[in-house]
Amino acid sequence: MTYRAEYLWIDGAEPTAEIRSKTKILADGDEPGIWGYDGSSTNQATGDNSDVVLKPVFQCPDPIRGGENILVMCETFLTDKETPHPTNTRALARAAEEKYGDQDPWFGLEQEYTMIDPVSYTHLTLPTIRSV
């Protein structure tokens, strides 16, 4: 039997980063491995040197296809398979986590509001609001 591995990655950031994918048919028991694609079609390489390497970093069941099919989240690398592609922002996040992983992250949420006069649609300042 076989199953489908849907490789997913983030493409070049020009004009904006998008999710790309391609499917590989694997025999039962085979694990998804390193794969590649033509980076010139995703603004990640020039036509004369267009190979980009996909390295799997996470896999999970495919919720759309079901069965034994899986989604394979990938990072992009240059052809030496060691150097992250310049558009691989996950590599930067991984490096930061490795460096600062022993620290506890703190998050601060801020919600801003603007008071607008319903007649003139001008912004109301605090002294104006107090006089209303």
Where are these regions (language model features)?
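Acidic/polar, glycine-rich intrinsically disordered N-terminal extensions of enzymes
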Residues: 1-100
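Acidic-residue sensor for enzyme active/binding pockets
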Residues: 75, 110-112
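Flexible, glycine/charged-enriched surface loops at secondary-structure junctions
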Residues: 101-110
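Short, conserved secondary-structure transition motifs
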Residues: 112-120
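Conserved small/polar residues in nucleotide/adenosyl-binding loops
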Residues: 122-128
